[in-house]
From Swiss-Prot:
Involved in tetrahydrobiopterin biosynthesis. Seems to both prevent the formation of 7-pterins and accelerate the formation of quinonoid-BH2. May also have a positive regulatory role in the expression of phhA. InterPro entries: PCD_sf, Pterin-4-alpha-carb_dehyd, Pterin_deHydtase. This is Pterin-4-alpha-carbinolamine dehydratase. It comes from the Bacteria. The lineage of its organism: Bacteria, Pseudomonadati, Pseudomonadota, Gammaproteobacteria, Pseudomonadales. GO terms for biological process: tetrahydrobiopterin biosynthetic process. Belongs to the pterin-4-alpha-carbinolamine dehydratase family. The keyword Lyase applies. Homodimer.
Amino acid sequence: MTALTQAHCEACRADAPHVSDEELPVLLRQIPDWNIEVRDGIMQLEKVYLFKNFKHALAFTNAVGEISEAEGHHPGLLTEWGKVTVTWWSHSIKGLHRNDFIMAARTDEVAKTAEGRK
């Protein structure tokens, strides 16, 4: 468990600061195996989780949905047979905010107890 898993998301408005170049490597070290992807000029965090079948992948998707609703911050989720791709970014600032790293860490916590992980 990291400090990020204990933190809570804050309201993120259009004028909220992006994660700085100095903060980025520090935060990334706390969420191993997450990748930075840039789509349409927007930096995002992304990770693929593998499962034994679609049922387990769907259950994980729903569990991520539950923690997302609780924090009011929602990812991109692509659920496929045996695989869930989770993508975090802050829509309002079109980039990465500390909230995205908090939720990536929490997603990893959910994955630790998810049934049917490969």
